[in-house]
Amino acid sequence: MRLAVIGGDGIGPEVVAEGLRVLRAVHPKVETTDYDLGARRWHETGETLPDSVLAELRGHDAILLGAVGDPGVPSGVLERGLLLRLRFELDHHVNLRPVRLYPGVTSPLAGDPAIDMIVVREGTEGPYAGAGGTLRRGTPQEVATEESLNTRFGVERVVRDAFARASRRPRAHLTLVHKTNVLTKAGDLWARTVAEVGAEFPAVSVDYQHVDAASMFFVTDPARFDVVVTDNMFGDILTDIGAAITGGIGLAASGNLDPSGANPSMFEPVHGSAPDIAGQGLADPTATVASVAMLLDHLGHADEAARVEGAVAASLAARAAAGGARRSTREIGDDLATRAAG
């Protein structure tokens, strides 16, 4: 496996180091290349993602990212210049976010709800495509536009991915989330595409929720969801709700995928760089390790992925049974690597 590693800023390098230890515990043949990208590089050079680095990244099987950013970088610089550019250039059109409540993890929701869903979020279109502009900026007549771009090609490929994932799960249920009653043009495209592709997956049951209703049901009845497919912005919001109800953003893993394999997919914890605790051994690497499980699964190493996922579940349950005593980044990494190694 040829793996590009972007430790990034703050706690990013710390959690990535533990993720790599767990990866090597189950898959020793890993060749890594480290890339200095993020806030530190921007402060020193003004660069976010040089073309030469992007070209090198394309030569890897996958990318493991820690976290990027610090308060000194203006909003949007790293988001658009690095993270979104990687998504667009590497065609990461599927953003995959598991939403699972592990045994022993406390949810803020009452009643110990059963939560086990996957959100399949479109990753290269919608309002994040960068279309729009500003007129008469800084004047009382200022106009700002952000256009949501939805193509049949882009919608269909993410919908197909979602149906395929639903067909492999026991419940085989897919929910389209949109706002078809107001966003009638884009909503119609999404709804028709789901209906047409769904005809090819007769074993998958399908329903629809407006995004506002889905937001409520994520909190009041999350067990109703199995696989959710939605556009870029709605998915961005819903998945953070999903993280909040399953133990917090610190346990949330994600994958930015080109399922075709033409480009390396990227895997990362959802949390930020947390510069206030960097270097203190306080960061929990569990989300990074869960992202490593997704990486292995994506590259076809299902058995190794299951071992890492099992290690995450067992470690979280053991920590809960021990009363949730604080452990260092390294200690958690030790535990996860030992469990994964079997």
From Swiss-Prot:
Gene Ontology MF annotations: 3-isopropylmalate dehydrogenase activity; magnesium ion binding; NAD binding
GO cellular component entries: cytoplasm
Top EC class of this enzyme: oxidoreductase
Pathway where this protein functions: Amino-acid biosynthesis; L-leucine biosynthesis; L-leucine from 3-methyl-2-oxobutanoate: step 3/4
Source species taxonomy: Bacteria, Bacillati, Actinomycetota, Actinomycetes, Frankiales
PANTHER family (alphabetical): D-MALATE DEHYDROGENASE [DECARBOXYLATING]
Coiled-coil segments: none
HAMAP family: LeuB_type2
EC number(s) on file: 1.1.1.85
Record's cofactor remark: Binds 1 Mg(2+) or Mn(2+) ion per subunit.
Name of the protein in its database record: 3-isopropylmalate dehydrogenase
